[in-house]
Amino acid sequence: MHNGVMKAWLESSHLAGANATYVEDLYELYLSDPDLVSEEWKRVFDGLPAHPTNVVEQPHSRVRDYFRRLAQETKHYNVQVSDPEVDAKQVKVLQLINAYRFRGHEAAKLDPLGLWNRPEVAELNPSFHNLTQEDMEETFNVGSFAIGKDTMKLKDIYQSLQKIYCGSVGAEYMHITDTEQKRWIQQRLEPVVGTPVFSKEEKRTFLEELTAAEGLERYLGAKFPGAKRFSLEGGDALVPMTKEMIRHAGASGMREVVIGMAHRGRLNMLVNVLGKKPQDLFDEFAGKHGEGWGTGDVKYHQGFSADFATPGGDVHLALAFNPSHLEIVNPVVMGSVRARQDRLGDEDCSKVLPITIHGDSAIAGQGVVAETFNMSQARGFCVGGTVRIVVNNQVGFTTSNPRDTRSTMYCTDIAKMVQAPIFHVNSDDPEAVAFVTRLALDYRNEFKRDVVIDLVCYRRHGHNEADEPNATQPLMYQKIKKHPTPRKLYADVLTERGECDLETATQLVNEYRDALDHGEVVVKEWRPMAMHSVDWSPYLGHDWHIPWNSEYAMERLQDLGRRVCQYPESHVLHSRVEKIYQDRLSMISGEKMLDWGMAETLAYATLLDDGKRIRISGQDSGRGTFFHRHAVLHNQNDASTYIPLSQIHAGQGPFEVFDSVLSEEAVLAFEYGYATAEPSGLTLWEAQFGDFANGAQVVIDQFISSGEQKWGRLCGLTMLLPHGYEGQGPEHSSARLERYLQLCAEQNMQVVVPSTPAQVYHMIRRQVVRPMRRPLVVMSPKSLLRHPLCVSSMEDLAHGTFQPAIGEIDALNPSQVKRVVFCSGKVYYDLLEQRRANEQQDVAIVRIEQLYPFPLEEVQAAIANYTNVVDYVWCQEEPQNQGAWYSSQHNFRAAIPAGADLKYAGRPASASPAVGYMSVHMKQQKALIEDALTLA
């Protein structure tokens, strides 16, 4: 109860962070004359800690202004305080200024169609603050109002506030608790007074870019009527906005820009921003495509790369490939950017800029958006802020009523969870759009935080060009039909100002249409790529059978083992962790056999020794969910951390392990993006339990399993999914192996179930050393991490290799074997122990360690000597409708002799992955083991 009262008090208190600016202005009045503030505020300020009598408190704004003037001019100014005779209404003036900062956006002219019916905001009226018409001619101190003056008449203050906060830009930033950030925005927003200044050349550029945006859509509509293109029309300003963002980024020193967006306006961006040849796009509309391999994807999912000339040099652009699943590309872009920043050593995030482009319904509706915002400042996922642009066309397919699409005032309110400033802007005002674009990027670069631009526009056609929007939005589309295009409106504005003429505007239209007819690049800033940002050439054209060197010199391996077991003497470990590290030293010396954790650590150490980068993330990945990894050592005295794998030697590759935010979808998407931009190293995502990975099913289905076939995108991401039936119930038993196997085709990925420490060692090394990059899905163990039989020798690591299938290990007489049991994973040890207990000699057990691509030759070799076999059995712990049985039995049948019988031993089909009662689990487990080992 106490916590609830305290929370309520803080939220309503004047000490709440959102009121900081207002309180500071009141305090400055109090310093000039305590009687100018109310008795309540006077008591608050009187109660502040007193300064020594020889110290005089000065208003903060005066001090800031003083030093600002010193920096700009040679002569000095004395600090002066306000006139003590200022009228008490001064407080009301400051309240009015604050009201506009907080709520002016609610009265801004944001909707190009003028259809928004928003209630009046009483606080924006001077009369609400008891300011009369007579007061309008009075002069008041403006406080922190960054208008360039200390005092102004109230009428001038009021008019300025209207222009700044209620024009084409609606600024939301007072929810930010950091006063420095709010002051920074005010000092750049308020002096402009709603009228940004641009040169004649810049204005012509904006008109040219609006002409291009409109011209392409009209050209496509005429040339390919009825074809889906998800037109940008109505949101044309996105093209000049994005190009201005890139130009400003280049001038700021950026070297790369990575863009993620959905289908709306994508074709326009490809042609008019990234420089895709119009003829190539026309060929796609006509059904032509290259003779490459792969199934391909629709044109509005395609990515693209190019270089773009800016005042600061060429900037490399990359538009990410993406599916129609809205918003999922955003964490992919962040992962790609993080990889590029790591590769460039861009520690201050000043060289690579992420831009994500959203829809208004999607940013409010898709849960991955909140996950992505939550990652934005987390250590393992921060990219120094993302510029997030919302193409707010006020309708999602057929739904336009905000009460149906969200529960908030704006679609962008979700961004307030990370205190991102939000700039709403009317897309029919391209100069306001350009101003907000620069302001947003400058904020991102200054504070390295996310910033949102809400580009309020409309959709001239239906969801696609074959759709009829009047059926569901009749009033909106009656208005749109009569509404001039953004190009026409801006051309008229420039003509009225005398900065352009009708002939010039028409000439731009004709020149752009002629350029489209020629089919060549229409972006004047386009440059051929000097070099690929990410070099994939070493990994192209290789199949699964390319040889790789699994050997590692024993002496070097032992040396690495000793190094990764060292930590400073002053670093006090938990007793259990200390025992694990002592045991690992014994494993290196040969006194003990290697367990899973040590073999895994040695695999990482060898890759780091070769200069490869390793990145591991997941919930609890530093320690490991099951207390086996301990890559991060925590000092029990001061909570400091030490990572032995980062301290092997000076020339090693970088090693990073992050305990991720508690998200599967956004984090896995981030790691996919990272792996697609960092092919040379190891990128590994680990689920806390494999059961929870289906929270990221969109990433698995749309990117990991199919990205190569759809888009030709290689990816070497590794997924560790703890899997195994140990009586822990339906939520902690199954990584849903069957779903990954169902997705396997066309050699698209690997599904592996390693059963020994040596296997996991070679599996990890193979993923990096072998010059082929495809996803690796691993059913990793839980109880096997400490199983007494699940051990390997140093010899197995140094001179062994990964075995896709492992034959019988006991000395059985092949002629006596009547049954061969195939299996994968933990169940092997249950079968082995029970067979030994039974002293059976007639059943051989073969482990299939790699279920896809299926190792047909290796399995056939493992059973070749068993010529008297009566039947073959596939044994699994999972229910019959799950696991590998349904998805892989055709492979098992192909491996055994023609006409041989293949039986199933496992749990019966079940709607749930596992039972919830330990007693039932044990009964089922015993039955399936007996079934597998008992001959008919």
Model-derived segments and spans:
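Glycine/aspartate-rich loop-and-adjacent alpha/beta segment that forms the canonical ThDP
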Residues: 100-103, 107-160, 168, 277, ...
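Thiamine diphosphate
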Residues: 2-7, 16, 46, 119, ...
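Subset of Sec-pathway N-terminal targeting signals
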Residues: 2, 7-48
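Conserved phosphate/anionic-ligand binding catalytic regions in large, soluble enzymes, centered on
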Residues: 95-112, 244-273, 358-377, 448, ...
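Extended, charge-enriched "interface" segments that sit outside catalytic cores
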Residues: 48-238, 254
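Cofactor-binding active-site loop characterized by glycine-rich and histidine/acidic residues
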Residues: 255-419, 423, 626-678
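Hard-cation-handling environments
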Residues: 486-487, 497, 501-614
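Active-site cores of enzymes that catalyze phosphoryl transfer or operate on phosphate-rich substrates
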Residues: 194-216, 283-345, 644, 771-837
